[in-house]
UniProtKB/Swiss-Prot annotation:
InterPro entries registered for this protein in UniProt: TMEM192
Domain of life: Eukaryota
GO CC annotations on file: late endosome; lysosomal membrane
Localization, UniProt: Lysosome membrane; Late endosome
Membrane topology annotation: Multi-pass membrane protein
Gene that produces this protein: tmem192
Subunit structure: Homodimer.
Family, per entry: Belongs to the TMEM192 family.
Chief site of localization: membrane
Name assigned to this protein: Transmembrane protein 192
Transmembrane segments: 53-73, 88-108, 137-157, 169-189
Keyword Membrane (UniProt): yes
Amino acid sequence: MAALSTGLSTSSGDLTQSADEDGFLDAPLLPSQKLQSVIRPHFHPVPTICISILLALVNLAYVTLAVVAIYFCLFSEKEKKCKQSIDPFQLSTVLVISKLVLWLLHVVNERFAQHHHCKARSRGFLHLYRSTRHLKALPLIIHSTGNAALLLILSVQDSFTSNSQLYPCLILSVLLLELILSVICLIIYTVRIYRFNKSKPRPDIIEEEKINAFHGHVNPEIGFRHSASLEEVVEKQGDTIEYLKHHNALLSKQLLALASNQD
């Protein structure tokens, strides 16, 4: 009797499980277009181009105004009128204060770019993040170095006042060098981001799978390259795992939302 009751309960459990599986299989399937829209990630461009162009124009305008101010306040016949217009400040003080404002703009631009590049990194664009990691910070580094050079010039100016017209020319030379180097970096960065946004690539891991499938082999180790260092391999593996975790969590939420809408 005990064996009979055990067999009946097992059979009843199998029937219940079979009924549940049949009900699950009979559930309406999600449309293929909706599945494709969920599985294929939507491309989000990196919105840093306009800020970089605007910052380059501000940098150019600042250096142009500095050249005009130095010329009219030191080398033209309107020297007294120019000094009266900036009174009670000296010309070097005005240049340094405006230079500080420009440096703060570069700090804001670097933080803004870093924020959006981290978001692109979480979406799987690991190569873009690495290739622009130092490039986007170069203008800020250049201007920080220029600030140190200006402090050195001003400290020497207070100690040696024999040639008062030499120091504004040295300041102008530093500003021109900063302008050339930072604008070159901003242009290179802007072109690279513009090409990335225009091409609208898929995440790096999807592109690598496509290339491996085309060549007929599968890469057994994520991020492994024979020419890469161990640090690069570990960093890329960590970034890839973080992207996959983020993508799987987002995909699960979207599939659950679509399934609830079908009910």
